[in-house]
From Swiss-Prot:
UniProt pathway: Protein modification; protein ubiquitination
Sorted UniProt keywords: Immunity, Innate immunity, Phosphoprotein, Transferase, Ubl conjugation pathway
Disordered, as annotated region: 1-24
Subunit note: Interacts with TRAF6, MAP3K14 and MAP3K7.
Post-translational modification: Phosphorylated by IRAK1 enhancing its E3 ligase activity.
High-level lineage: Eukaryota, Metazoa, Chordata, Craniata, Vertebrata
This protein's name: E3 ubiquitin-protein ligase pellino homolog 3
PANTHER family: E3 UBIQUITIN-PROTEIN LIGASE PELLINO HOMOLOG 3 (PTHR12098:SF9), E3 UBIQUITIN-PROTEIN LIGASE PELLINO-RELATED (PTHR12098)
Major enzyme class: transferase
Function text: E3 ubiquitin ligase catalyzing the covalent attachment of ubiquitin moieties onto substrate proteins. Involved in the TLR and IL-1 signaling pathways via interaction with the complex containing IRAK kinases and TRAF6. Mediates 'Lys-63'-linked polyubiquitination of IRAK1. Can activate AP1/JUN and ELK1. Acts as a regulator of innate immunity by mediating 'Lys-63'-linked polyubiquitination of RIPK2 downstream of NOD1 and NOD2, thereby transforming RIPK2 into a scaffolding protein for downstream effectors, ultimately leading to activation of the NF-kappa-B and MAP kinases signaling.
Reactions performed catalytically: S-ubiquitinyl-[E2 ubiquitin-conjugating enzyme]-L-cysteine + [acceptor protein]-L-lysine = [E2 ubiquitin-conjugating enzyme]-L-cysteine + N(6)-ubiquitinyl-[acceptor protein]-L-lysine
EC number: 2.3.2.27
Summary of the knockout phenotype: Mice show impaired clearance of C.rodentium due to decreased NOD2 signaling. Mice display decreased muramyl dipeptide (MDP)-induced expression of cytokines.
Length: 445
């Protein structure tokens, strides 16, 4: 048996890992340590799951929801690296993991493990994200299927880790948030087995990747009207940034990207191999439209009394309070290839191309004919612009800047594929642009 302590493990290159709190997730209603009675706690930021348009199909409940605000906890729950042990027998490894000490275990072989222990850090909070419903997980995330909705039921094969990742937030200004792969389990341990990608860093420390990986993309130019998609990277257990592996579960890591960090920015995307999350900062959310603004835009669009150019019936976007069940009688429909907006009609089908293919009576272009739905998750919008564009082929409506940004943003799919998708429902985008400008006809009177 060899037990070697290494005090250098707490150097700045090692992540400031965190201790999961017993309080559960700290959302907007949780009191902050320094918040006075009736005041909101300091908010670090918000996580929004793509594909739900503001609410889970079954409703937002507890830690399982489509959106979660991370706020300062009543008491810091941080831990930081303390000592690194080289273990030559599995018995000692088991003894260490059972002491209640927070640690990361790197199994190098059947007879050799490296365990990094952590001590309390009063300057940081941690929030854990994953598929597990255990108390140490603050935000329970399940797989999102293309077209909206979660993959549910015991037969569903999830690719999201039970303890997928953790976000560490500084308790003092500027409240920087950093993301790390993997989260602590019920025994306060992060375990990387023999098959996991792991290695010794140049300064003698350990690092590794999770099985399916945690990918992050920071937008170029911030999350605003001038934003452009960034480059997808993989985040390690210790928070280092690497280029992507050949596939999500490959054992060979990518190259270290030294000039990039794991600090979350407004608009950063986090992919957990089954669900993609958007990080919004408090400052960024101030620039985003509010639900009241989105409702005002809906009422303004309906007040213009758009008409079906063929049936001459007045069209109107339904209230979001109705939910997305079946299209309303006055619901606008669109030919997604050309953008001409009509009321619903049952003619113009092209049987040789399937029931969803229709011929536009105005321009004769043939393509999908779908109802229009307003995007209701305000945090996904880049600007408060008018609802002028729709994603193809799902028909979700938003501003031009928002539509063009998401249509140009490739989202991870499967083990190595990327595909642009509607942020409101998760449907894969089609066509040359992925979105279309809507062409309404005003009232004839």
């Amino acid at each position: 048996m060899v037990l070697e302590g290494n005090p250098d493990v707490g150097s700045p290159r090692t992540s400031d890992l965190q201790h999961p709190g017993s309080q559960g997730s700290c959302i907007l209603s949780c009191p902050g340590e320094e918040a006075l009675a009736g005041e909101e706690p300091i908010k670090y930021g918000e996580l929004i799951v793509l594909g739900y348009n503001g609410c889970l199909a079954s409703g937002d409940k507890g830690r399982r929801r489509s959106r979660l605000a991370l706020s300062r906890r009543p008491h810091a729950n941080g831990v930081k690296p303390d000592v690194m042990h080289h273990i030559s027998t599995p018995l000692v490894s088991k003894a260490l993991s059972n002491r209640g000490q927070h640690s990361i275990s790197f199994t190098l072989s059947r007879s050799h493990s490296v365990i990094v222990e952590y001590t309390h850090d009063s300057d940081k909070d941690m929030f854990q994200i994953g598929r597990s419903t255990e108390n140490m997980i603050d935000f329970v995330v399940t797989d999102t299927s293309p077209g909206g909705g979660a993959t549910e039921g015991p037969s569903a094969q999830s690719t999201i880790s039970r303890y997928a990742c953790r976000i560490l937030c500084d308790r003092r200004p500027p409240y920087t948030a950093r993301i790390y792969a993997a989260g602590f389990d019920a025994s306060s341990n992060i375990f990387l087995g023999e098959r996991a990608a792991k290695w010794r860093t140049p300064d003698g420390l350990m690092d590794g990747l999770t099985t399916n990986g945690v990918l992050v993309m920071h937008p170029a130019g911030g999350f605003s009207e001038d934003s452009a998609p960034g480059v997808w990277r993989e985040i390690s257990v210790c928070g280092n940034v690497y280029t992507l592996r050949d596939s999500r579960s490959a054992q060979q890591r990518g190259k270290l990207v030294e000039n990039e960090s794991n600090v979350l920015q407004d608009g950063s995307l986090i992919d957990l191999c089954g669900a993609t999350l958007l990080w919004r900062t408090p400052a960024g959310l101030l620039r985003a439209p509010t639900l009241k603004q989105l409702e005002a835009q809906r009422q303004e669009a309906n007040a213009a009394r758009p008409q079906c150019p063929v049936g001459l019936s007045t069209l109107a976007f339904p209230s979001p309070a109705r939910g997305r069940t079946a299209p309303d009688k006055q619901q606008p429909w669109v030919y997604v290839r050309c953008g001409h907006v009509h009321g619903y009609h049952g003619w113009g089908c092209r049987r040789e191309r399937g029931p969803q293919e229709r011929e536009c009576p105005l321009c004769r272009l043939v393509g999908p004919y779908v109802p229009l739905w307003l995007g209701q998750e305000a945090g996904l919008c880049l600007d408060p612009g008018p609802p002028s564009h729709a994603f193809a082929p799902c028909g979700h409506v938003c501003s031009e800047k928002t539509a063009r940004y998401w249509a140009q943003t490739p989202l991870p799919h499967g083990t190595h594929a990327f595909h642009a998708a509607c942020p409101f429902c998760g449907a894969w985008l089609t066509g040359e642009l992925g979105c279309v400008r809507l062409i309404f006809q005003g009232p004839l009177d």
